[in-house]
Amino acid sequence: MQENKQPSEIQGELPQPPDGESVPPQPTNEQAPPDTDTMPRIEETLRQLELKAAEHHDAWLRARAETENVRRRAQEDIAKASKFAAEKFAAAMLPVKDSLEAALTIEKQTLESLREGVELTLKQLNAAFQNGGLTEEDPAGQKFDPNKHQAISAIEAEGEPNTVLNVLQKGYLLHGRVIRPAMVMVSKAKGT
């Protein structure tokens, strides 16, 4: 009769082969025989992942093409904006040109009517400038600013040095940016 062995002792013992025979190794979890259902499942999973990868690649290509189209359209818009930036201003200049041409067609003008015509044309021109964001810089009596003024000469004068005494030619700003500095005469301290 066999002795009653403890479960821990039973687990550690392997069955012994009869004398002279060898026992083939028992499969363990690491050496499990291939499951016949596993390969088709792996192939199906691989096929699904390949489809998803193809979808993602296609979406990436579409996004890349769309980005390129947006970039190209933006460049075209910038080129058009640059090309036609002066369109509004040019349209505002046309009535001024028309007025000047009309004045030249009148053969017998009085000095007074010519003056009135020039004043009206100047008003049209000033309105066009104002609508286009072009403003005059007339700095008489102001402190000299080298960013907005160009000093033609300096004259000894009473008062604060570097003050604009006389404006020889007005300056112009386009939306606050100097496009032509005012040509000015400035004061300097006596004896310098």
Curated annotation (Swiss-Prot):
Which Pfam families does the UniProt record give? GrpE
Q: Which GO terms describe its cellular component?
A: cytosol
Question: What are the recorded GO MF terms, alphabetically?
Answer: adenyl-nucleotide exchange factor activity; protein homodimerization activity; protein-folding chaperone binding; unfolded protein binding
Q: Which GO terms describe its biological process?
A: protein folding
InterPro entries associated with the record: GrpE, GrpE_coiled_coil, GrpE_head
Subcellular location(s): the record lists: Cytoplasm
Give the PANTHER family listed for this entry. GRPE PROTEIN, GRPE PROTEIN HOMOLOG, MITOCHONDRIAL
The family line of this record is:
Belongs to the GrpE family.
Q: What is this protein called?
A: Protein GrpE
- Which species? Aromatoleum aromaticum (strain DSM 19018 / LMG 30748 / EbN1) (Azoarcus sp. (strain EbN1))
Q: What is the lineage of its organism?
A: Bacteria, Pseudomonadati, Pseudomonadota, Betaproteobacteria, Rhodocyclales
Name the gene for this chain: grpE
